[in-house]
Amino acid sequence: MAAVALMPPPLLLLLLLASPPAASAPSARDPFAPQLGDTQNCQLRCRDRDLGPQPSQAGLEGASESPYDRAVLISACERGCRLFSICRFVARSSKPNATQTECEAACVEAYVKEAEQQACSHGCWSQPAEPEPEQKRKVLEAPSGALSLLDLFSTLCNDLVNSAQGFVSSTWTYYLQTDNGKVVVFQTQPIVESLGFQGGRLQRVEVTWRGSHPEALEVHVDPVGPLDKVRKAKIRVKTSSKAKVESEEPQDNDFLSCMSRRSGLPRWILACCLFLSVLVMLWLSCSTLVTAPGQHLKFQPLTLEQHKGFMMEPDWPLYPPPSHACEDSLPPYKLKLDLTKL
């Protein structure tokens, strides 16, 4: 305190102005509080508790303590609160001791002075192990089975739509090099403006190197016109993810919009084709179940008299006719053997 009293008034005023506003006024609402947890209570504990040096170090560093040093320690403590929330959010660990260890290790890595490390560790221990809003939400709100199934189904549908959109939506880029060393990039992105319009727009991006480093680029975007006029030129097409130009017009993210941007056809044509395809498939499925009338085999039941007549007077002989010997053939040869000579 004697050193503070001996300071000139201008220097003391500069120290008071240089102190961070966190030490004098409560901080504003944290936008990351819903995800990481609220740290207001932890920061209030940091401001209320004395974060000065330990009693063993009071005689050595007591003379050098100033409002600025206290503000630095309070800032380190508040940073420890936030580091604990970040470690808990990243690790998702149910063991608070593991998160405390990670937070203290982060404090040691962030600060060099021992007093600041201790203040940061104090912030780690002051932050609650679980966010209070999340605890209240778990107690008050019971999970619903139907709602969870609905959320799962909606998440699955969104994943399928996003994967289809990522597969369908692509950008074609044309690269040309002029005589003066400039590289002209033609990038197409089909956009359907009205129901009767087919095609897309074409944007010309002129890229110029300004220096030896690849980062020194000068990009100029120039809308050229409809894409149908440029398709006549035979240019080598190369798909690339570099030098992409985002469209300023809002685009829909549904399946028909993706197919419309991909093919350049209006949405109503794609919807009609899809509807007609479904009707044709239904008609084919129903037509295969009905067989032609000529292919049916009709069996009429026989009466008792018809059955007897069918058995007694058959239309065909039951036995094959006997075979008659041919008259023109030679008589059989009779062989006589002398048994005494054998």
Curated annotation (Swiss-Prot):
Residues 1-24 form the signal peptide. Keywords: Glycoprotein, Golgi apparatus, Membrane, Signal, Transmembrane, Transmembrane helix. GO terms for cellular component: Golgi membrane; membrane. A motif (Microbody targeting signal) lies at residues 340-342. It is found in: Golgi apparatus membrane. Expressed preferentially at high level in the brain. Its main location: Golgi. Glycans are attached at N97. It comes from the Eukaryota. The keyword Ribonucleoprotein does not apply. One of its GO terms (biological process) is branching involved in ureteric bud morphogenesis. It is a single-pass type I membrane protein. The keyword Transport does not apply. Pfam families: BSMAP (PF12280). The chain crosses the membrane at residues 268-290. InterPro entries: Uncharacterised_TMEM59. Belongs to the TMEM59 family. Modulates the O-glycosylation and complex N-glycosylation steps occurring during the Golgi maturation of APP. Inhibits APP transport to the cell surface and further shedding. This is Transmembrane protein 59-like.
